[in-house]
Amino acid sequence: ELTDRWRQQYKPAMDRVRNGQAPWQHLDQLHRQSLEALAGEFGLALDEALLQRITGFWHRLRPWPDTLAGMHALKADYWLAALSNGNTALMLDVARHAGLPWDMLLCADLFGHYKPDPQVYLGACRLLDLPPQEVMLCAAHNYDLKAARALGLKTAFIARPLEYGPGQSQDLAAEQDWDLIASDLLDLHRQLAASA
């Protein structure tokens, strides 16, 4: 239950920053604060070392089964850039731990904003030196795709029905007619290859 509750704090913590209710803090800091609050709520006494260790779990996330093969297939024809609400140090660790072959990491701390703020999507296009209509955001989150589409980016929904755990009730399916809707990254590669 603690783990699920901690994961559920992700978006509300970022929203407090986005809405000006809290000063800018990167995602590791937000995860740490959420963990401290939940530890108190659950009556757990976590010392500094344990707080750091548990917060560090986010740095060692495992990729979905299709991720590596799909990314390598896509990388043969496209630039692959992570556009993440994670901070750069977090995403570097995730990439190294999982062997993710990103060409570039575009993280929230580069922009001082979290998605779905426009500064993140447009900042990514600027850093890639591409107009929005030549950039495709691939995501498992409909809110993310909606914000990207509103700014002119192409969109691809990747189904991840366990993204939020076994009780997931949101983002189970595409909620709009995105440019592409794929079951995984290998399916996305097949669809892109067929449309080329």
Descriptions of predicted regions:
Residues T3-Q52:
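A metal-dependent, Asp-based hydrolase signature
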